Amino acid sequence: TLSESVNMRPILMKGHERPLTFLKYNREGDLLFSCAKDHTPTVWFADNGERLGTYKGHNGAVWCCDLSRDCRRLITGSADQSAKLWDVQTGAELFTFKFDSPARAVNFAVGDKLAVITTDPFMELTSAIHVKTISSDPHERAYLF
């Protein structure tokens, strides 16, 4: 049977100080990205659970994340009414998209030239879908066109 042939061992990953909100593997499956209410997205080695790094800059719970196809950029959505674009390798914040309500979901489009971000209803505002153009040059600061 399958359960007899697969030898699974649990890996305990310690690092977040508040509850987790989202998990995402990269395409190769060797990295795991986690989001939590502690404001700090984190990247882990998937095979041993070792923390590789964190992405510091949000001031609220981080609800979600997505990776570019080449795994060079990470986008995160937060309760701090922003979505942030990061350099995966260095952890550098590349750009911040600001909104009038919390960013609840983020996703890169095929080709990584567009990102879609949804925002929650907030006070008198309704929920919204925002499509943002992403620069192909990671050093270019003008991510919005």
Model-found features: residue ranges?
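Intrinsically disordered, low-complexity acidic/Ser/Thr/Pro-rich linker and tail segments
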Residues: 1-22, 30-31, 42, 120
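Solenoidal tandem-repeat scaffolds enriched in leucines and small polar residues
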Residues: 105-145
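WD40-repeat beta-propellers
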Residues: 41-46, 65, 83-87, 106, ...
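Short C-terminal beta-strands that terminate individual repeats in beta-propeller domains
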Residues: 2, 9-15, 35, 51-57, ...
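Structural hallmark of WD40 beta-propellers
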Residues: 30-33, 42, 51-53, 71-75, ...
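Conserved strand-to-loop turn within each blade of WD40 beta-propeller repeats
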Residues: 28, 35-38, 45, 77-80, ...
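WD40/WD-repeat beta-propeller blade-loop signature
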Residues: 9, 16-19, 28, 51, ...
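Loop/turn segments within WD40 beta-propeller blades
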Residues: 24-29, 66-71, 107-113
